Amino acid sequence: MNKIDSIIIHCSATRAGQDLTAKDIDRMHRARGFNQIGYNYVIRIDGTIEKGRSLTVDGAHCNTKGFSESSYNKHSVGVCYIGGLDANGKPADTRTPSQKATLRQLVAELCKEYDIIEVLGHRDTSPDLDGSGEVEPKEYIKACPCFDVRSEFCLLYTSPSPRDCS
Protein backbone atom coordinates (compact mmCIF):
# COMPACT_ATOMS: atom_id res chain seq x y z
CA MET A 1 0.00 0.00 0.00
CA ASN A 2 1.12 3.56 -0.66
CA LYS A 3 1.46 6.12 2.13
CA ILE A 4 -1.78 6.13 4.13
CA ASP A 5 -3.36 9.59 4.20
CA SER A 6 -7.13 8.96 4.33
CA ILE A 7 -9.74 7.08 6.31
CA ILE A 8 -12.93 5.91 4.61
CA ILE A 9 -15.87 5.03 6.88
CA HIS A 10 -18.35 2.39 5.68
CA CYS A 11 -21.41 0.58 6.99
CA SER A 12 -22.19 -3.08 6.43
CA ALA A 13 -25.66 -2.19 5.05
CA THR A 14 -27.33 -4.55 7.50
CA ARG A 15 -30.44 -3.90 9.54
CA ALA A 16 -30.24 -2.45 13.03
CA GLY A 17 -29.45 -5.15 15.59
CA GLN A 18 -28.10 -7.65 13.04
CA ASP A 19 -24.53 -8.30 14.17
CA LEU A 20 -21.76 -9.54 11.88
CA THR A 21 -18.12 -10.37 12.48
CA ALA A 22 -15.09 -9.61 10.35
CA LYS A 23 -15.08 -13.33 9.47
CA ASP A 24 -18.68 -13.06 8.24
CA ILE A 25 -17.76 -10.12 6.01
CA ASP A 26 -14.65 -11.96 4.82
CA ARG A 27 -16.86 -14.87 3.70
CA MET A 28 -19.27 -12.46 1.98
CA HIS A 29 -16.45 -10.65 0.18
CA ARG A 30 -14.83 -13.93 -0.92
CA ALA A 31 -18.21 -15.04 -2.30
CA ARG A 32 -18.16 -11.83 -4.41
CA GLY A 33 -14.69 -12.67 -5.79
CA PHE A 34 -12.45 -10.77 -3.38
CA ASN A 35 -9.35 -12.61 -2.13
CA GLN A 36 -10.14 -11.48 1.44
CA ILE A 37 -12.19 -8.95 3.41
CA GLY A 38 -11.95 -5.50 1.85
CA TYR A 39 -12.00 -3.47 5.09
CA ASN A 40 -9.10 -3.00 7.48
CA TYR A 41 -11.28 -2.71 10.59
CA VAL A 42 -14.80 -3.79 11.53
CA ILE A 43 -16.68 -2.27 14.48
CA ARG A 44 -19.30 -4.62 15.84
CA ILE A 45 -22.57 -3.56 17.49
CA ASP A 46 -21.07 -3.82 20.99
CA GLY A 47 -18.16 -1.56 19.96
CA THR A 48 -15.60 -4.36 19.63
CA ILE A 49 -12.98 -3.73 16.94
CA GLU A 50 -12.00 -6.65 14.74
CA LYS A 51 -9.10 -6.48 12.32
CA GLY A 52 -9.69 -7.23 8.69
CA ARG A 53 -7.29 -6.81 5.78
CA SER A 54 -3.72 -5.95 6.71
CA LEU A 55 -2.67 -2.34 6.18
CA THR A 56 0.34 -3.63 4.22
CA VAL A 57 -2.01 -4.74 1.43
CA ASP A 58 -4.08 -2.42 -0.80
CA GLY A 59 -7.66 -2.20 0.42
CA ALA A 60 -10.74 -3.38 -1.46
CA HIS A 61 -13.32 -1.05 0.03
CA CYS A 62 -13.49 2.09 -2.12
CA ASN A 63 -13.06 1.69 -5.85
CA THR A 64 -14.73 4.91 -7.02
CA LYS A 65 -11.54 5.97 -8.85
CA GLY A 66 -11.01 2.57 -10.47
CA PHE A 67 -7.74 0.71 -10.19
CA SER A 68 -5.52 3.73 -10.84
CA GLU A 69 -2.78 4.89 -8.49
CA SER A 70 -5.20 7.55 -7.21
CA SER A 71 -7.68 4.88 -6.05
CA TYR A 72 -8.56 5.31 -2.38
CA ASN A 73 -7.82 1.59 -2.00
CA LYS A 74 -4.14 2.45 -2.48
CA HIS A 75 -3.83 5.05 0.30
CA SER A 76 -6.68 4.76 2.78
CA VAL A 77 -7.80 2.78 5.79
CA GLY A 78 -11.25 1.21 5.42
CA VAL A 79 -13.35 1.10 8.59
CA CYS A 80 -16.77 -0.58 8.55
CA TYR A 81 -19.35 -0.35 11.32
CA ILE A 82 -22.02 -3.03 11.47
CA GLY A 83 -25.40 -1.55 10.59
CA GLY A 84 -26.57 1.27 8.36
CA LEU A 85 -30.15 0.18 7.65
CA ASP A 86 -33.25 0.66 9.77
CA ALA A 87 -35.78 -2.12 10.48
CA ASN A 88 -37.41 -1.45 7.09
CA GLY A 89 -34.13 -1.69 5.18
CA LYS A 90 -33.81 2.07 4.60
CA PRO A 91 -30.44 3.85 5.06
CA ALA A 92 -30.09 5.15 8.63
CA ASP A 93 -27.41 5.93 11.17
CA THR A 94 -27.87 2.86 13.35
CA ARG A 95 -24.60 3.14 15.26
CA THR A 96 -24.86 2.24 18.91
CA PRO A 97 -23.28 4.54 21.51
CA SER A 98 -20.50 1.94 21.84
CA GLN A 99 -19.88 1.97 18.08
CA LYS A 100 -19.75 5.77 18.03
CA ALA A 101 -17.24 5.87 20.89
CA THR A 102 -15.08 3.15 19.36
CA LEU A 103 -15.13 4.80 15.94
CA ARG A 104 -14.03 8.15 17.39
CA GLN A 105 -11.23 6.44 19.33
CA LEU A 106 -10.05 4.44 16.30
CA VAL A 107 -10.06 7.51 14.04
CA ALA A 108 -8.08 9.47 16.66
CA GLU A 109 -5.52 6.65 16.93
CA LEU A 110 -5.16 6.35 13.15
CA CYS A 111 -4.75 10.14 12.84
CA LYS A 112 -1.91 10.00 15.37
CA GLU A 113 -0.21 7.05 13.66
CA TYR A 114 -0.53 8.26 10.05
CA ASP A 115 -0.48 11.66 8.39
CA ILE A 116 -4.24 11.64 7.77
CA ILE A 117 -5.48 14.54 5.66
CA GLU A 118 -9.11 13.47 5.24
CA VAL A 119 -11.76 11.33 6.88
CA LEU A 120 -14.62 10.56 4.51
CA GLY A 121 -17.73 8.46 4.26
CA HIS A 122 -17.83 6.06 1.34
CA ARG A 123 -20.60 8.20 -0.18
CA ASP A 124 -18.25 11.24 -0.11
CA THR A 125 -16.01 9.54 -2.69
CA SER A 126 -18.80 9.60 -5.29
CA PRO A 127 -18.02 11.67 -8.39
CA ASP A 128 -18.88 15.38 -8.41
CA LEU A 129 -21.27 15.08 -11.34
CA ASP A 130 -22.28 18.73 -11.57
CA GLY A 131 -18.73 20.08 -11.15
CA SER A 132 -19.66 22.25 -8.16
CA GLY A 133 -16.58 21.19 -6.19
CA GLU A 134 -18.72 19.36 -3.63
CA VAL A 135 -20.32 15.92 -3.75
CA GLU A 136 -23.95 16.59 -2.91
CA PRO A 137 -26.55 14.06 -1.70
CA LYS A 138 -28.12 13.87 -5.16
CA GLU A 139 -24.72 12.67 -6.47
CA TYR A 140 -24.13 9.89 -3.94
CA ILE A 141 -23.65 6.50 -5.56
CA LYS A 142 -24.76 4.96 -2.27
CA ALA A 143 -25.79 6.21 1.19
CA CYS A 144 -22.95 4.40 2.99
CA PRO A 145 -22.14 5.00 5.83
CA CYS A 146 -25.55 6.65 6.42
CA PHE A 147 -24.25 9.61 8.46
CA ASP A 148 -22.30 12.78 7.69
CA VAL A 149 -18.70 11.75 8.32
CA ARG A 150 -17.24 15.13 7.35
CA SER A 151 -19.20 17.04 9.98
CA GLU A 152 -18.55 14.42 12.66
CA PHE A 153 -14.83 14.05 11.94
CA CYS A 154 -13.48 17.46 10.94
CA LEU A 155 -9.70 17.64 10.70
CA LEU A 156 -7.28 20.44 11.34
CA TYR A 157 -4.90 19.89 8.45
CA THR A 158 -1.99 21.48 10.29
CA SER A 159 -2.42 19.07 13.19
CA PRO A 160 -4.22 15.95 12.01
CA SER A 161 -6.59 15.15 14.84
CA PRO A 162 -10.36 14.88 14.87
CA ARG A 163 -12.24 17.82 16.32
CA ASP A 164 -15.83 18.86 16.54
CA CYS A 165 -17.04 21.34 13.96
CA SER A 166 -19.75 23.79 14.83
Show which residues each predicted segment covers.
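Secreted/luminal cysteine- and crosslink-motif detector
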Residues: 145-147, 166
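Acidic, glycine-anchored loop motifs typical of Ca2+
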Residues: 129-136
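Single conserved hydrophobic/aromatic residue that forms the stacking wall/gate
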Residues: 157-166
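Active-site-adjacent loop/helix surface patches within enzyme catalytic domains
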Residues: 2-118, 133
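A short acidic, often aromatic-flanked loop/helix-cap motif at beta-alpha or helix-coil junctions
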Residues: 58, 127-128
